């Protein structure tokens, strides 16, 4: 990438240590395009085997005595394109071969993810579900990027856009829900018990790179437009969480729709970072059915999106976003099965072009939102991106 030397200074040990430091599950992608079965099998053994073998001994010599716990393992990546330009029939056979030799060592249980469809390639999903037995595949990936104009050669600027291009971006990102529904429908025919997850492990905005940067590094800035895109996508993923157990934005740092940007020793949080901060309480909670009265901000662009969940303590979390550039909404929130006794809210809102820079790192940040609770209902003014939480256990009002 970018025509520069890769010195491999950030390898397996450094990546796994990073995951430990930030408290996340590692997700390793195996090379099926140009790598061998033996190479991937050895890598899994190197990382997870707690015994005597050449790979385990090599890991110990490299400074790691105990094996890591590795759950998520991708068997190839974008095998339809840059990962090998394969047909789904051919990849299905390769997957079965490679996956056979990726074994569960020392109590470690792999969650094996097949290289799934590019956007709306439904035939790819059909073939994989038909030819790869569910017991040998825990997940299937889906990749979809939000490109404002649908033109990969002229994607547009991350920061300089007009109202028309803004709404094209939102319309493009909304397209992912139809794809999720159709891919899920195919999967339902072969896997009605939802044993195979749809893993949306590459999503987000993709613009032209920032002027003066290496085109191969895919470095782009991040505005409130990206925050709205992130919120819409996360709401969609929540709504379809029965089939989607995991979704991963691309990427985390300095590439595409990043949550962090760095410059030397400096780090800034992008508007997208703050969206993830607002939405994180949905994780490990249970989806609640929700419905919202809506209007269109532009043709094919609903103004509002939402999702709701409840955690083990009975706390309810509601996330809302407003894609309209011209209209605010007074939103009345009610629970059909209970009354709201107290609520608190946070909001991320600013001009649609607003962004954080190294000179002004906190231009876009989360603020407290006024929430009025009355007669078991909560009311807020929805300017832009909103997070509402119900911090006390919901109780029925008689």
Predicted regions and their residues:
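N-terminal catalytic cores of secreted or lumenal carbohydrate-active enzymes
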Residues: 1-162, 181
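Aromatic-lined carbohydrate-recognition surfaces of secreted/lumenal glycan-active proteins
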Residues: 31, 59-60, 101-122, 176-205, ...
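Glycoside hydrolase catalytic-domain groove-lining segments
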Residues: 147-214
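Aromatic/acidic polysaccharide-binding cleft in carbohydrate-active enzymes
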Residues: 195-306
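Short, well-ordered beta-strand segments enriched in hydrophobic/aromatic residues
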Residues: 314-322
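Surface-exposed beta-strand/loop patches in extracellular or lumenal glycoproteins
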Residues: 325-338
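Acidic, Ser/Thr/Pro-rich beta/coil linker or hinge segments at domain junctions
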Residues: 339-382
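Conserved small/polar residues in nucleotide/adenosyl-binding loops
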Residues: 386-392
């Amino acid at each position: 990438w970018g025509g520069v030397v890769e010195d491999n200074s950030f390898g397996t040990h450094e990546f796994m240590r990073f995951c430990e430091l930030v408290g996340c599950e590692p997700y390793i992608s195996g090379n099926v395009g140009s790598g061998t079965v033996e190479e991937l099998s050895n890598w899994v053994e190197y990382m997870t085997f707690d015994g005597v073998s050449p790979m385990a001994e090599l890991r110990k010599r490299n400074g790691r005595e105990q094996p890591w716990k590795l759950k998520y393992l991708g068997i190839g990546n974008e095998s339809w394109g840059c990962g090998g330009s394969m047909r789904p029939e051919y990849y299905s056979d390769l997957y079965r071969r490679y996956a056979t030799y990726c074994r569960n060592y020392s109590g470690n249980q792999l969650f094996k993810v097949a290289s799934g469809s590019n956007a709306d390639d439904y035939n790819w999903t059909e073939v994989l579900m038909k030819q790869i037995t569910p017991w040998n595949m825990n997940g299937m990936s889906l990749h979809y990027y939000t490109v404002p104009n649908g033109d990969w050669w002229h994607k547009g600027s991350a920061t300089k856009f007009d109202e028309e291009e803004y709404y094209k971006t939102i319309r493009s990102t909304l397209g992912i829900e139809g794809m999720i529904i159709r891919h899920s429908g195919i999967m339902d025919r072969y896997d009605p018990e939802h044993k195979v997850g749809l893993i949306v492990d590459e999503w987000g905005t993709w613009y032209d790179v920032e002027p003066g940067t290496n085109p191969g590094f895919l470095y782009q800035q991040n505005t409130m437009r990206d925050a709205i895109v992130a919120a819409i996508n996360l709401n969609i993923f929540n709504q379809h969480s029965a089939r989607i157990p995991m979704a991963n934005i691309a990427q985390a740092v300095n590439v595409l729709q990043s949550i962090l940007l760095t410059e030397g020793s400096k780090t800034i949080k992008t508007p997208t970072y703050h969206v993830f901060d607002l939405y994180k309480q949905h994780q490990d909670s249970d989806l609640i059915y929700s419905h919202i009265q809506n209007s269109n901000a532009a043709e094919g662009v609903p103004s509002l999106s939402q999702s709701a969940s409840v955690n083990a303590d009975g706390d309810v979390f509601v996330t809302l976003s407003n894609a309209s550039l011209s209209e605010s909404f007074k939103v009345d929130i009610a629970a059909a099965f209970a009354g709201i006794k107290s609520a608190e809210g946070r909001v991320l809102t600013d001009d649609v072009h607003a962004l954080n820079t190294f000179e002004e790192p906190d231009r876009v940040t989360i603020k407290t939102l006024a929430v009025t609770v009355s007669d078991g209902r909560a009311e807020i003014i929805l300017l832009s991106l909103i997070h509402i939480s119900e911090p006390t256990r919901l109780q029925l009002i008689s």
